[in-house]
Design a protein with these regions (language model features):
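Conserved C-lobe activation region of Hanks-type protein kinase-like domains
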Residues: 135-193
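Catalytic-loop of the protein kinase fold
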Residues: 59-80
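Conserved end of the kinase activation segment
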Residues: 112-125
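Activation segment/activation loop of eukaryotic-type protein kinase catalytic domains
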Residues: 75-115
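Terminal C-lobe "cap" of eukaryotic-type protein kinase domains
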Residues: 200-231
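Regulatory extensions appended to serine/threonine kinase catalytic cores
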Residues: 219-223, 227-263
């Protein structure tokens, strides 16, 4: 596999006739597996949306060759800039009839959760769920989730049922303490909230295996999100919309009063 942004094995190495390992392209940049406050210093939310698109385009290029990443997760990504990122640990991707033997429960689609990944081939639809979880985690960078994929606040998974956060058409009926991740969520536009909610909530029309958004669908939504940040559309109603770590939840601004014309 020789694709831009993919650090996959290029050559096998042998020692005294025994397989010793593989050579792979060097991945530059910083990792996304830890606290990201310092990593994203100076970044805007528009930059974060562009990074998500960059990563999705790389995943999409693999899909076009019928290759699935399999072990989709933030720790397998290194970042140089919003326009340059690398998928690493690509020696475990699913190719032809060779399954990806590893995975993280946090990103795993409900229909394959708890199974031995080495015993079956994932579907692209299952990968689409992982992609949605990846984008959710990237747009909502925080440590409110532990390694098992559970909220420290509420102890529930992102893709638990019901989904923890309000989205258009569904309200939990009980307030969620406004932790940093919930504050970030409040500043996302409704179309993105809806896409995430309808994917992770079993009542949503994007939850079923056959109905999930693919890479192209997420790219379309993220590009629109970025454009509305850059042209000021979202900032007109929400001055903190472009902040990666807003200090407060979104405040609904009153409609602008029409100018008074004196005749």
């Amino acid at each position: 596999i020789r694709l831009k942004g993919v650090c996959a094995p290029q050559r096998m190495l042998f020692s005294n006739g025994f397989f010793a390992g593989c050579l792979m392209p060097e991945a530059k940049g910083f990792g996304l597996e830890g606290p990201l406050d310092k990593c994203f210093a100076g970044w805007s939310r528009a930059d974060l949306a562009q990074l998500a698109v960059t990563i999705l385009k790389t995943i999409g290029s693999l899909h076009r060759f019928n290759v699935l990443v399999g072990d989709v997760n933030l720790s397998n990504i290194r970042v140089v800039s919003p326009d340059e990122a690398y998928l690493i640990d690509c020696d475990s991707v699913q190719v032809a009839n060779l399954p990806c033997p590893v995975g993280h429960e946090m990103y795993t689609a409900p229909e394959i959760r708890g199974r031995d990944f080495s015993t079956f081939l994932r579907s692209k639809s299952s990968e689409n769920h992982a992609v949605a979880a990846l984008i959710f985690m990237l747009l909502m960078p925080d440590e409110d989730l532990d390694e098992s994929g559970k909220y420290r606040l509420g102890a529930r998974r992102i893709s638990s049922d019901p989904f923890l956060l309000d989205y258009p058409g569904f309200h939990r009926g009980e307030p969620l303490t406004l932790c940093r991740r919930a504050r970030i969520w409040s500043h996302l536009p409704d179309d993105l909230k809806s896409a995430f909610g309808r994917t992770f909530d079993s009542r949503g029309n994007l939850h079923a295996e056959a109905d999930r958004l693919g890479v192209a669908g997420w790219i379309l939504r993220l590009n629109a999100y970025r454009e509305r940040l850059l042209d000021g559309t979202l900032l007109a109603d929400d001055p903190l919309a472009n902040e990666i770590y807003p200090k407060t939840g979104r405040k609904i601004l009153p409609p602008a009063r029409p100018a008074c014309v004196v005749r």
